[in-house]
Design a protein with these regions (language model features):
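Active-site phosphate-binding strand-loop segment of PLP-dependent enzymes
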Residues: 144, 149-220
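Conserved core segment of the aminotransferase class I/II
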Residues: 225-304, 314-315, 399
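N-terminal small-domain helix-loop-helix segment of the aminotransferase-like
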Residues: 2-6, 11-103, 110, 289-292, ...
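Helix C-cap/helix->beta junction micro-motif
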Residues: 31, 139, 199-200, 230, ...
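A short helix-loop-beta submotif of the ANL/AMP-binding
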Residues: 138-144
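PLP-dependent enzyme catalytic core of the Aspartate aminotransferase-like
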Residues: 87, 162-163, 344-346, 354-363, ...
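Conserved glycine-rich beta-strand-loop-beta hairpin in the small C-terminal domain of fold type I
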Residues: 287, 303-317, 325-339, 373
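Conserved PLP-anchoring active-site segment centered on the Schiff-base-forming lysine
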Residues: 114-136
């Protein structure tokens, strides 16, 4: 019988957040073992619930959601997103510049498919949210990774960005707030990136899904607000801020001048039409979510769950000999470093796999985020403090077998 293999288009595509280590975790769970899953930022799994008014809107609009919507999304949702862009000072955004998607993930893939030819290059941060690298590869492009510097609060290394630009570079991706590091970029860094894009005629892709999960009195700046003369594509959604990851509500906004990207926009419209529309029922919660009381704010202040869990895991990690981490300013993740002079760790994927098998905690290895060395891993700090406390005890015990 003829064998069928995966497409050659997938040869360089990887998404290790849901890779081999997760497969082992699923096998263990199927055998009745209890696993603490710290591999994905899924708020509902850890007792975070959607605001009541969001659920009410969903129920009330069920009958009105039985048919297709406009391929870009329903008017009320796009109108609310346009007004949100105004609050964020993102310039030159009209209703037709907004696309609703089944989460930001859906739109990341679409945005790359519509832009890239074989061999085109896109600058992507290192570490990154790996879907960006995967989407570039799937579209036939090459992801060229620029360094984010751990010694400088995980901010992008501006000189490294400059050194990576070639005649094939079409765009730069900026993930801010950053996943997996939790870094929040100051305006000075963003302005330097904007200037690089300006000088090299690059499109800016801004992944800002965590812009409403900022702590310590900090403020998020949309990079598009600093680049009114540049074409920017900004991604955002409700999965994290409103604890509705399963609803799949994301959006993509085109801002700035558009006369020179008409062909690209035609491609985006074609791809948008091909998928008919995103989930109509979920689109109905956008207006209430963006216009109503932002209950997530309570979680990010002293005494709030996310704030306190962030503080706990930061101290717990740094109290473990040979581990260190930069304190996250935003988001749901921390990205600890292993001191390889103290511990014999040469394969970070094998490290987290053995940790899973021995300690029943699921993490993601650093190279799963396209980090260059096998010396990091990511922790999701969504569980309550009593569950997070297990990590300190179990990681301290586990590391002893790697001691030099």
């Amino acid at each position: 019988m003829k064998e069928y293999n995966k497409s050659s288009k997938l040869e360089h595509v990887a998404y290790d957040i849901r890779g081999p280590v997760l497969e082992e975790a699923m096998r263990m769970r199927a055998n009745g073992e209890k696993i603490l899953r710290l591999n994905t930022g899924n708020p509902a799994e850890f007792g975070f619930t959607a605001p009541d008014e969001v659920i009410h809107d969903l129920i009330m609009n069920a009958r009105d959601s039985e048919g297709y919507s406009d391929s870009k999304g329903i008017f009320s949702a796009r109108k609310a997103i346009m007004q949100y862009c105004q609050l964020k000072k993102i310039p030159n955004v009209d209703i037709d510049d907004i696309y609703l998607g089944n989460g930001v993930s859906d739109l990341i893939v679409m945005s790359m498919q519509g832009l890239l030819d074989n061999g085109d290059e896109v600058l992507v941060p290192m570490p990154d949210y790996p879907l960006w690298t995967a989407a570039v590869s799937l579209a036939g492009g090459n992801a060229v990774h620029y360094l984010c510097d751990e010694e400088a609060n995980w901010y992008p290394d501006i000189e490294d960005i400059k050194s990576k630009i070639t005649s094939n570079t079409k765009a730069i991706v900026v993930i801010n707030p950053n996943n997996p590091t939790g870094a929040l970029y100051p305006d000075e860094i963003l302005l330097e990136i904007v200037e690089i894009a300006r000088q090299n005629n690059l499109i800016i892709f801004a992944d800002e899904i965590y812009d409403r999960l900022v702590m310590d009195g900090e403020k998020h700046t949309a990079i598009a607000s600093l680049a009114p003369d540049l074409f920017c594509v900004s991604m955002n959604g409700l999965s994290k801020s409103h604890r509705i990851a399963g609803f799949r509500v994301g959006w993509m906004v085109l801002s700035g001048p558009k006369h020179h990207v008409k062909g690209y926009i035609e491609g985006l419209n074609m791809l948008s039409n091909m998928r008919l529309c995103s989930n109509v029922l979920s689109q109905h919660v956008v207006q209430t979510s963006l216009g109503g009381y932002q209950s997530v704010d309570e979680l990010l202040l002293p005494g709030g769950r996310i704030y306190e869990q962030r503080n706990f895991i930061y101290k717990a990690i740094n109290d473990i000999p040979g581990l260190s981490a930069v304190k996250p300013k935003a988001g749901l993740y921390i990205f600890p470093k292993i001191d390889r002079d103290m511990y014999r760790v040469d394969d970070d994927e094998q490290f987290v796999l053995e940790f899973l098998k021995q300690e029943k905690i699921l993490l993601v290895h650093g190279r799963g985020f396209n980090w260059k060395d096998p010396d990091h891993f990511r922790i999701v700090y969504l569980p309550r403090v009593d569950e997070l406390a297990q990590i300190q005890e179990k990681m301290t015990r586990f590391l002893k077998q790697y001691k030099r």
